[in-house]
UniProtKB/Swiss-Prot annotation:
Enzyme class: oxidoreductase
Domain of life: Bacteria
Record's cofactor remark: Binds 1 Mg(2+) or Mn(2+) ion per subunit.
One MF term in the entry's GO annotations: 3-isopropylmalate dehydrogenase activity
Name assigned to this protein: 3-isopropylmalate dehydrogenase
Subcellular location: Cytoplasm
Obligatory cofactor(s): Mg(2+); Mn(2+)
Sites where the protein binds Mg(2+): D226, D250, D254
GO biological process, any: L-leucine biosynthetic process
EC number: 1.1.1.85
Lineage, opening ranks: Bacteria, Pseudomonadati, Pseudomonadota, Gammaproteobacteria, Pasteurellales
Gene expressing this chain: leuB
């Protein structure tokens, strides 16, 4: 029997509540599909600041080092905003984890589920077609990290500058990640760039074309970022995998998230070259609803499914979770964020419904 060690970092706000439901669902699939998950919980974020005085204690990092994957909840809240920025939960925990594990690839699925069309802000005829896409975003290069970066001059001559830099090897590895994702899906990649203006995008487009030759089954399309943001609104059903640089992926993934209608539905994964990953909901810690039992656990549950698929290659078990989520939603069960006129189910009830549907 295959055994995997999972570092569980529930974090702050609704993190512990939704994490409990993800573990409940994982317990069900490991029993059904015959593999073993060993869960070890660690403090992170504000919870770690309160208990240990720092957002990412040494024992948490050590535990993550010893694990095969990290299942992450959410961090942050108004309680810790008075701290210096680099000591706050988000910057003091997530960014160091990404750096330590060299997590260069961010996967953000965006799916409009049947029965949830009314929550989609797009026109009804567009929403009726549904959509199921994943944004593959490069996380460690580009304008956020490129040098030189800074300010000089004074008065009206004050100047600020950032540099968009990409090495070919950075583009090669993120392109392969996107094509690998496409092979597990509908075999379409849309590479997003600005190759009519930017040198970095010209290299991006050239490199993606080279990598595409390794994946003859995958259909590739190049699209300028400005057009991509429009097509995402006009015809979201036409996208499968969107391959983006850091800044373009930052923008596109949030746009894709918004048109699903609920942040409580959106998982994400950040991976390194070895397939080690950190899996977390795309939404925040929502301290305003923490402890009330009304948070939507689906994003955390789907993040767990992504862990099974991308770090452990347990595709059948991952699909079973995703199908269970679809079935529960199709049966009309909703947490408060999605309840229309129906009586909403609690966080724990939603987790139990999904576990029972596997």
């Amino acid at each position: 029997m295959s055994t995997y060690n999972v570092a569980v970092l529930p974090g702050d706000g609704i993190g512990p509540e939704v994490m409990a439901e993800a573990i409940k669902v994982l317990d069900k699939v490991q029993a059904k599909f015959g593999f073993k998950l060993n869960f070890t919980q660690y403090l992170v974020g504000g919870a770690a600041i309160d208990a240990k005085g720092e957002p990412l204690p040494a024992e948490t990092l050590q535990g993550c080092d010893n694990a095969d994957a990290i299942l992450f909840g959410s961090v942050g809240g108004p309680k810790w905003t008075h701290l210096p920025p680099d000591q706050q939960p988000e910057r003091g925990a997530l960014l160091p984890l990404r750096k330590h594990f060299k997590l260069f690839c961010n996967l953000r699925p965006a799916t409009l589920y049947k029965g949830l069309e009314k929550f989609c802000p797009l026109r009804a005829d567009i929403a009726a077609k549904g959509f199921d896409m994943v944004v593959v975003r490069e996380l460690t290069g580009g304008i956020y990290f490129g040098q030189p970066k800074g300010r000089d001059g004074e008065g009206s001559d004050t100047r600020a500058f950032d540099t968009e830099v990409y090495y070919k090897y950075e583009i090669e590895r993120i392109a392969r990640a996107a094509f690998d994702a496409a092979m597990k899906r509908r075999k379409q990649v849309t590479s997003v760039d600005k190759a009519n203006v930017l040198q970095s995008s010209i290299l991006w487009r050239e490199t993606v074309a080279e990598i595409a030759k390794e994946y003859p089954e995958v259909q590739v399309e190049n699209m300028y970022i400005d057009n991509a943001t429009m097509q995402l609104i006009k015809a979201p059903e036409s996208f499968d995998v969107l391959l983006c640089s850091n800044i373009f992926g930052d923008i596109i993934s949030d746009e894709a998230a918004m048109i699903t209608g609920s942040m409580g539905m959106l998982p994400s994964a950040s991976l390194n070259e070895e397939g080690f990953g950190l899996y977390e909901p795309a939404g925040g810690s929502a301290p305003d609803i923490a402890g009330k039992g009304i948070a939507n656990p689906i994003a955390q549950i789907l993040s767990a499914a992504m862990m099974l698929r991308y770090s452990f290659n347990l595709n059948e078990a991952a699909t079973a979770i995703e199908n269970a989520v679809q079935k529960v939603l199709a049966d009309g069960h909703r947490t408060g964020d999605l309840a229309d006129n129906s009586t909403p189910v609690s966080t724990a009830e939603m987790g139990t419904l999904i576990a029972n549907a596997i």
